Structures are given as structure tokens and as C-alpha cells.
From Swiss-Prot:
Pfam families: EPSP_synthase (PF00275). It is found in: Cytoplasm. One of its GO terms (cellular component) is cytoplasm. One of its GO terms (molecular function) is 3-phosphoshikimate 1-carboxyvinyltransferase activity. SUPFAM superfamilies: EPT/RTPC-like. Keywords: Amino-acid biosynthesis, Aromatic amino acid biosynthesis, Cytoplasm, Transferase. The lineage of its organism: Bacteria, Bacillati, Bacillota, Clostridia, Thermoanaerobacterales. The keyword Cell inner membrane does not apply. This is 3-phosphoshikimate 1-carboxyvinyltransferase. One of its GO terms (biological process) is chorismate biosynthetic process. The keyword Acyltransferase does not apply. Its EC number is 2.5.1.19. CDD domains: EPSP_synthase (cd01556).
Length: 429
């Protein structure tokens, strides 16, 4: 599919973004391990989350929906999970594969999990290694670093593990495995990463404690199903936020967006660039902080994005590079080498596609350097099969001088079904 973006004067009005992808995955996982019904609204019916749904259905869990944005999981406890009759397919979802590995490691049956061609190239050794330390038998290509991966699970031993890099997925996989261990599991982070797993484990009744940079989960009593309204995904909101900042007549309010402090690095970085952004009506939904975000057109300036800020905005770096292209001065992004092993090499893809549109941008081994301001020219872009690259190119095209074409844009459905329609409904021609 091809997406055509024409220049816009701005974005105006109120909008809601789809439910948070990270939380939607975890609702299905914990709802499947819990006893009783879990009913979630504002669930993201994107391709990645649907892969998680399919995996748990294959393990014998009764899941109704998603019907629109509502899903019901009728959990019967972890002992009700059964060996899948076929290979589990995580599709393009690294979250599905890595977190599922943690759960499968604790099950008394054999599983094989794989994914599409892109996911089969992404490294899994950071997860499989510590799970093997906990007692799981795991086999796969290149010493269990590449899928397909086979797991012979069973009773695990709790461990104390220091993450070699900041990774919410690795932390989450080990905490989920810790539910099935014979003693507590402690995970220590080099810097804070998104904490949705800890919050949701506690909400479902698990015994979770945080002390400094460490999180501990105990072999848990029975998890209990619950009702949850999933907040809007700030990673999806980021595309509208940057689009409003760089188009000249914008005044946009995004409603009910998750503002978990481990995810709001995008707001901090843009504030450092001079963005006119305000957050109002703070509240809680399902144990997660939620608020409305108002964004107005702004004159941006260059900044440095590095260190502990990176895990708090890692998914937003492609669209931050778009903001930087329109900012006055130099923006330096570093400590982001992890982006090279996402759905695409996001550093290379961002540099290539923004260069195509006329940006002054270059790669470094662990980041990007962008000089602005530049009025981008429009042109023909490749999504690289990566939803975040496709949407970043679309945002860049809104403020360009001519039409922008994004090829292979169907990948956007991974995280934001209906993105183009939502964008068009807000634009000033």
C-alpha cells in the first residue's frame, strides 16, 4: 500500500490515539495467566498485539475479540495453559516473542516460537541466556540467539540479574519467568526503563517490589482477572505532537494519553527544544497515569538527546529526528545503538528517508546528527517495513513543500490502524 501526504497548514481539534501497545500486550499475557475474566477497553487491535492474542489462543486460553477496542480474556490460571499443537508465531512482534519466552520457560511442556523474516533476524540471546540460567532448556539458531526457538520449560530457580543494557523487554521476560520460580527473582537496571510490567503485575495481584534500580518479583499467589481501560499510546501520540509543532497554524489536544514517567522522554526532549506543550487533567487509569496533551505550533531549537533519556523515548527517535530537521541549530542523538536491531535499522532508515526529503542528517555508530532548519521538499520514501519509519515520513511530509509518497505503508497497522484517516481529520488545508 502507498500513502500520499500533501502539505498542510496545521492540525486543529481534539483527537484520541489508539491504546498503548505495550500495555495491550501485557493485558493479554497477564489476563491469560490470571484466574477469572479480564475485560480491557481501548485495546490496540494492531498486528503485533493480535500476534500475542493468537499465541495464547494456541496455548488454550479463551479470548473473545477484539471487538472494536474491547477484548475479554477468560483466564483459568497458568496451570490451564496447554502445549500448542503447532509452532507459535509472533509475527513481527519482538515484544510478543521476548515476553512469551519468559512465560514459556516456566511451563511444564515443550514450545517452539518463531516470527516473520524480520523478527527471525533480531537477537534473542539477551533473553534466552538468563532464562537458561534460571533452569529452562532453550535451543535455537546461533546458540538460541535467533528464532525459531524451542523451549522445554519447567520449574525455574529465581536469580539476581543485572541487565547489560537498558531493556524493558528483557526485564519483563525475567519478571514473568519469576512468577514460576522457586524463589524471588531480582532484576537490576542500568537506567530506568518503562515499568508497565511491574505496574500490571501488581494490579493483577503479584508480589512485586522496587528498591532503587532493582525490581523483585516473588513466586506469586493466584493472579486475579480485572477490568482495565488502556491509556492512549504516547508513542502514537508523538507523531501528532511533532506534526502539530512543525506546521504553522496548529492547535491540537490529544485526549487520555498515557503519561507514565518512564515513557514521557519525548515531552522532555521537545520541551528542551522550545515546544509549546502543556499537560492537563492528570489522573489514573488501570494503575497508569493519564492526561490530556495540548500542542501548538512552535519555533524549535536544536538539543542533545542522550543517556538516561534514551530509554524513555527510544521508540520516538525517528519522529524526533523530523522535529530536529525543522529546528534551528544542531540536534545530536547518541546512546541509541539499540535502534539498529528494531523492525529495521532505525538509525540508517531514518537517515536515508529524511535525506531523501532534503534533511541535513548523518548517522553515527549510536545515533544521529541533524542540522536545521530545513524546509523539506517531499519525495518518495520507503517504510523499510517499519511502522515508525512510515509514520515519521508522513509527519515530515505534512510540513514539506511538495507531495510525499510512502511506499509499503501497510506496516503502520502494526501500532496505529487508521493513522491516515485520523491525520486527515485534523488537518488544515
Amino acid at each position: 500500500m502507498t500513502l500520499k501526504i500533501t502539505p498542510a497548514r496545521g492540525l486543529r481539534g481534539e483527537a484520541w490515539v489508539p491504546g498503548d501497545k505495550s500495555i495491550s500486550h501485557r493485558v493479554v499475557m497477564l489476563g491469560s495467566l490470571a484466574r477469572g475474566e479480564t475485560a480491557a477497553t481501548n485495546f490496540l487491535p494492531g498486528e503485533d498485539c493480535l500476534a500475542t492474542v493468537r499465541c495464547f489462543r494456541a496455548l488454550g486460553v479463551e479470548i473473545e475479540g477484539p471487538d472494536g477496542d474491547t477484548i475479554r480474556i477468560r483466564g483459568r490460571g497458568p496451570e490451564a495453559l496447554t502445549e500448542a499443537p503447532d509452532v507459535l508465531d509472533a509475527g513481527n512482534s519482538g515484544t510478543t516473542m521476548r515476553l512469551m519466552l519468559g512465560i514459556l520457560a516456566g511451563q511444564p511442556f515443550f514450545s517452539v516460537i518463531t516470527g516473520d523474516a524480520s523478527l527471525r533476524r533480531r537477537p534473542m540471546g539477551r533473553v534466552t541466556g538468563p532464562l537458561q540460567e534460571m533452569g529452562a532448556t532453550i535451543l535455537g539458531r546461533r546458540n538460541a540467539n535467533l528464532a525459531p526457538i524451542a523451549v522445554a520449560g519447567g520449574r525455574l530457580s529465581g536469580i539476581r540479574y543485572r541487565l547489560p543494557v537498558a531493556s524493558a523487554q528483557l526485564k519483563s521476560a525475567l519478571l514473568l519467568a519469576g512468577l514460576f520460580a522457586d524463589s524471588p527473582t531480582e532484576v537490576t537496571e542500568p537506567v530506568a526503563t518503562r515499568d508497565h510490567t511491574e505496574r500490571m503485575l501488581a494490579a493483577f495481584g503479584a508480589l512485586v517490589a522496587r528498591r532503587g534500580s532493582s525490581v523483585t518479583v516473588a513466586p506469586s499467589p493466584e493472579l486475579c482477572g480485572r477490568e482495565i481501560r488502556i491509556p492512549g499510546d504516547i508513542s502514537s501520540a508523538a507523531f501528532f505532537i511533532v506534526a502539530a509543532l512543525i506546521t504553522p497554524e496548529s492547535d491540537l489536544v490529544l485526549k487520555d494519553v498515557g503519561v507514565n514517567p518512564t515513557r514521557t522522554g519525548i515531552l522532555d526532549a521537545l520541551a528542551n527544544m522550545g515546544a509549546r506543550i502543556s499537560v492537563s487533567r492528570p489522573r489514573e487509569s488501570g494503575g497508569e497515569p493519564v492526561a490530556d496533551i495540548r500542542v501548538r505550533s512552535s519555533a524549535l531549537r536544536g538539543t542533545v538527546i542522550e543517556g538516561a533519556l534514551i530509554p524513555r523515548l527510544v521508540d520516538e527517535i525517528p519522529v524526533l529526528a523530523v522535529a530536529a530537521a525543522y529546528a534551528d541549530g544542531e540536534t545530536v542523538i547518541r546512546d541509541a545503538a539499540e535502534l539498529r536491531v528494531k523492525e529495521s535499522d532505525r538509525l540508517a532508515a531514518t537517515r536515508k528517508e529524511l535525506s531523501t526529503l532534503g534533511a541535513d542528517i548523518r548517522e553515527t555508530p549510536d545515533g544521529l546528527v541533524i542540522r536545521g532548519p530545513r524546509r523539506l521538499t517531499g519525495g518518495s520514501c520507503n517504510s523499510h517495513g517499519d511502522h515508525r519509519i512510515a509514520m515519521a515520513a508522513a509527519v515530515a511530509g505534512l510540513a514539506a513543500s511538495d507531495v510525499t509518497i510512502i511506499r509499503d505503508s501497510n506496516c503502520i497497522d502494526v501500532s496505529f490502524p487508521g493513522f491516515a484517516h485520523a491525520l486527515n481529520s485534523l488537518r488544515l488545508e
